[in-house]
Swiss-Prot record:
Functional note: Orphan nuclear receptor.
Name listed for the protein in its UniProt record: Nuclear hormone receptor family member nhr-55
Extent of Low complexity compositional bias: 1-19
Family: Belongs to the nuclear hormone receptor family.
Chain positions covered by the region annotation Disordered: 1-20
Length: 424
């Protein structure tokens, strides 16, 4: 039985009855929710315990906006981390029992072990010469180093500039720009040419094909009235980014047409130059790259796209099934070229490309509805765009391979205008 003195001493303690807060063992002393046990010196829930373990030793919050007098919301929600940490400390939570650096992984030890490992790694050809293991060949000596093959294409740039300035070779009058481009495509393909089978592809053949491709694109674009209204600088810049996309699509379209008409065999690729209709077996042609690299094709196999031939075959088969008309093919060329140029140059070029694509899309709609009497054409356009997507994806993959080859200094080829040959 308690004595009166002990009872009176208890009532006269420093804490008044109004300031005493009694907590149940089942209630978190911080937020008032259901507790999980005693953590770091106080009865708390798991959320408050985790918060204190995470923030108890850091205390790197933004300062409280209410001078540490925030009101706590119901259901355990806190809007202010400093005030929540202060309440944790007020109820007796302490960092004395925190355990630091108990993980078996130590960054300092790992760094020392890594340095020791590198010191013990023996020199290989790759580490000694500074070249990748992807090319299994030692670096040549200074006497064996071959100077870069410099190719001046200024004459070609001047020819392309003159073509753009002079305009179309044949004046045409058509209902809209898309049909004019289709007629321009027929004019560029022109007369029948002598067939020629290419069995070897070297420097002269490669540069000749590039030159013919760029000239064809420049002549074809002169039949695009909206394009001709741009400044000469803008036309020249866009041509540099469009010619490879156009030539890739034109080559596959000609190959599909040649196979359908049985002009070439089913495993051949066909295109045309100014004077000849050329054909080649991709897997049988002899390729000479000694003029641009000191490595052989076998050594450069990693930098080649091994699946390119198979993907080209899929595109050719799709074109043989769809048999696009010249109007559809012209739209495909414009869409692929403008989309790529806009994505490459951005800014003003992107705005121009989007405006041209919208105009040509309206012309294609008129062509289907009024000329072809085909109001339900969405599925056909979708199949045509699948072909364009395949070609654009191949070009982007080729760009990655080209950049990788440039990093490893695989080719000793240098152009006077390198921006023209980024997408080879």
């Amino acid at each position: 039985m308690n004595s009166p003195s002990s009872s009176s001493s208890f009532c006269s303690s420093s804490s008044s009855p109004s300031s005493l807060v009694l907590y149940s063992p089942d209630t978190c002393q911080v937020c008032g929710q259901k507790s999980h046990g005693k953590h770091f010196g106080a009865v708390t829930c798991r959320a408050c315990a985790a918060f204190f373990r995470r923030c108890g030793s850091a205390n790197n919050f933004k300062p409280c906006r209410r001078n540490m007098n925030c009101e706590f919301l119901k259901n355990g929600w806190f809007n202010c981390k400093p005030c929540r940490l202060k309440k944790c400390q007020d109820v007796g939570m302490t960092i004395e029992n925190f355990q630091f650096d108990r993980d078996s992984f130590s960054p300092k030890k790992a760094k020392i072990a890594l340095e020791n490992f590198h010191n013990q790694v023996p020199f290989s050809i790759a580490t000694f010469t500074g070249r990748s293991n992807l090319i299994v060949i030692s670096a040549p000596t200074e006497e064996e180093c071959i100077p870069k093959c410099y190719i001046d294409v200024q004459f070609l740039i001047d020819k392309l500039s003159n073509v753009l300035k002079e305009g179309p070779e044949v004046p045409l009058h058509t209902p809209n720009a898309l049909e004019k481009l289709a007629l321009g495509l027929q004019i560029i393909r022109g007369r029948k040419r002598e067939l020629k089978l290419i069995t070897k592809l070297g420097k002269e053949e490669t540069l000749g094909l590039w030159q013919d491709d760029m000239m064809k694109v420049a002549k074809w674009l002169t039949y695009f009235d909206d394009f001709q209204q741009l400044s000469h600088r803008m036309r020249s810049e866009m041509l540099k980014g469009m010619w490879k996309v156009w030539s890739r699509l034109e080559t596959l379209a000609l190959t599909a047409m040649g196979r359908r008409l049985m002009i070439c065999q089913k495993d051949m690729i066909m295109t045309h130059t100014e004077k000849e209709q050329v054909m080649a077996h991709p897997k049988q042609i002899e390729v000479d790259i000694s003029w641009c690299s000191r490595y052989t094709l076998e050594q450069l196999r990693f930098f080649a796209d091994s699946d390119l031939d198979d993907r080209n075959e899929q595109v050719i088969q799709a074109m043989m099934e769809l048999q696009p008309t010249d109007v559809e093919l012209s739209y495909m060329m414009c869409q692929a070229c403008l989309h790529y140029a806009g994505k490459r140059y951005q800014g003003e070029v992107l705005e121009i490309a989007e405006r041209f694509q919208e105009t040509l899309s309206n012309h294609l709609h008129d062509y289907y509805v009024n000329r072809m009497n085909m109001p339900q054409y969405s599925m056909r356009v979708a199949n045509l765009m699948k072909i364009n997507n395949h070609i654009q994806l191949d070009i982007y993959r080729g760009r990655v391979k080209y950049d990788l080859a440039r990093v490893f200094d695989v080719f000793y080829l240098e152009f006077s205008h390198p921006e023209v040959f980024i997408d080879l």
